[in-house]
């Protein structure tokens, strides 16, 4: 049973890596600016969504705690 669990965890990890690489396609110079400003996204494919600023302002949203933890240092988002 532990092999099945390990396989599921590996698939989920690879899916998250692939998703973050696919949607975080920033131009090279923009990436440098973000690094210089110390913007850190734990999950860029989540933090770049258009509805994130609205969630940051709404403490009653069901995903508020998760978004604030993951996207706290996102430039222009939950700062």
UniProtKB/Swiss-Prot annotation:
GO terms for cellular component: extracellular region; nematocyst. It is found in: Nematocyst; Secreted. Residues 39-78 form the ShKT domain. It comes from the Eukaryota. Expressed in nematocytes (in planulae and primary polyps). Is localized predominantly in the body column nematocytes and not in the tentacles (in primary polyps). Disulfide bonds join 39-78, 47-71, 56-75. One of its GO terms (molecular function) is toxin activity. Transmembrane segments: none annotated. Keywords: Cleavage on pair of basic residues, Disulfide bond, Nematocyst, Neurotoxin, Secreted, Signal, Toxin. Residues 1-25 form the signal peptide. Residues 26-35 form a propeptide. The keyword Secreted applies. Neurotoxin. In vivo, induces contraction paralysis followed by death (within 2 hours) on zebrafish larvae. Also induces body contraction in Nematostella 11-dpf polyps. This is Neurotoxin ShK-like1.
């Amino acid at each position: 049973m532990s092999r099945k669990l390990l396989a599921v965890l590996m698939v989920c990890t690879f899916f998250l890596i692939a998703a973050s690489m696919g949607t975080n396609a920033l131009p090279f110079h923009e990436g440098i600016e973000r690094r210089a400003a110390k913007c850190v996204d734990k999950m860029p494919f989540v933090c770049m969504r258009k509805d994130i600023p609205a969630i940051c302002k709404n403490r009653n949203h069901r995903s508020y705690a998760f978004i604030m933890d993951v996207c706290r240092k996102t430039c222009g988002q939950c700062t």
